[in-house]
Amino acid sequence: MFKLTPREIVEELDKYIIGQQEAKKAVAIALRNRYRRKLLPDELREEIYPKNIIMIGSTGVGKTEIARRLARLVKAPFIKVEASKFTEVGYVGRDVDSMVRDLVETSIRLVKQEKMAAVEQKGRQMAEERIVDILLPFDGRKSKSPKNPFEFLLGSIQERDDVDDESERRRREIGQRREILRQKINRLELEDETIEIEVEEKNPSFMEIFSGSGVEEMGINLQDMLGNLMPRNKKKRKVSIAEARRILTYEESQRLLDMDEIHREGIKRAEEDGIIFLDEIDKIASKESNYGPDVSRGGVQRDILPIVEGSTVITKYGPARTDHVLFIAAGAFHVSKPSDLIPELQGRFPIRVELESLKKEDLKRILTEPNNSLIKQYIALLSTEKLTMDFTPEAIDYIAERAYEVNSRTEDIGARRLHTVMEKLLEDLLFNSPDMAGEKLVIDIDYVAERLDRIVEDEDLSRYIL
């Protein structure tokens, strides 16, 4: 069971996300409350519901990243959906129940990956045994057919003993050769050898054939219903032993899985640990309108309400309850405000967190401090071309200053501005790096100024290029 304290959760999030301590604290508390709830008696546990969160902040300040990193941290089923893509029942578009079905799919996939990892070693052994069978079949049953149909009952004991001795000798000999072959395969000495294997040919997915027809919205698994009616063809493929091991290990591991148990566990995990991130919630928060593009937004809110407050959604794996799913909504709320949501929906998101716009110092820290910082990413990318690159502290400071300046003068897109600035800054290097193998480059403030100043100072250029 997940036992990190709220402080430890925030420290983990700090490795990837700069600032936004209030938002980190809110999600850390929500996560710790799930752990606390699991320790309670059954009667009380059912009565405690998660406190859903609304994150308010402009694009690029870390709303989505906080939720995504949180889910990875606890290995919880997590999906991100855009609220603006849903439509009221009766309009063309996705209905809100599909987010729960997507969560269950994600949860089952997570459980299946864990179960596959648990049986992978056994599956690998079985796969290697199949490869040995292909290379050297174990057939020690060859014997002379009796001429008399009753000879197998009346034949001489001596003749039968001779046949048995010969069969036993051949069986031992083949067994020894198979063991030598098995050891060589296990030591990866025959990886490049080619063998012919039989693999199941996949039939076209029924869900793809009927995509767009709304069949998946009914919670019906046509693939399971009709897939067994289609013949499972096998085709022969010539592959290396390394590739054969991979294919056959997957096949054998699949056979070891109890899919019914995986489906049950996946649904339970989605119900107890699932996180649904509702992005662009502000886009459905506008005032009610009887015509135009806003006509179904109030209806979408009313459709989302029962999902958030707890209901049962029918999926192709079985019913899934949403009572204890954690919902994290997010939006910029530039045009609308949280109070524009219908009151019932506002009440289902009791925790509101405002994320701060990123300052120059925040952008500078984003460039260098996180484990996956942009500077580290570009240095690693160019190192694959045998090109060594480094940035001076002054250059990093100047990049952050220029990115902040563009954000202030044009649309504020937060940390995403750094991506466009860095791409423009390193465009020539990324293009010419294959011809610069072995060189060492230091990106200083002059290099940055030469490539960015003209674009940043020209407001029209910065709007279109950065």
Curated annotation (Swiss-Prot):
ATP binds at I18, G60, V61, G62, K63, T64, E65, D279, E344, R416. Its main location: cytoplasm. InterPro entries: AAA+_ATPase, ATP-dep_Clp_protease_ClpX, ATPase_AAA_core, Clp_ATPase_C, HslU, P-loop_NTPase. GO terms for biological process: protein unfolding; proteolysis involved in protein catabolic process. GO terms for cellular component: HslUV protease complex. Keywords: ATP-binding, Chaperone, Cytoplasm, Nucleotide-binding, Stress response. GO terms for molecular function: ATP binding; ATP hydrolysis activity; peptidase activity; proteasome-activating activity. ATPase subunit of a proteasome-like degradation complex; this subunit has chaperone activity. The binding of ATP and its subsequent hydrolysis by HslU are essential for unfolding of protein substrates subsequently hydrolyzed by HslV. HslU recognizes the N-terminal part of its protein substrates and unfolds these before they are guided to HslV for hydrolysis. HAMAP family: HslU. PANTHER family: ATP-DEPENDENT CLP PROTEASE ATP-BINDING SUBUNIT CLPX-LIKE, MITOCHONDRIAL-RELATED, ATP-DEPENDENT PROTEASE ATPASE SUBUNIT HSLU. A double ring-shaped homohexamer of HslV is capped on each side by a ring-shaped HslU homohexamer. The assembly of the HslU/HslV complex is dependent on binding of ATP. This is ATP-dependent protease ATPase subunit HslU. The gene is hslU.
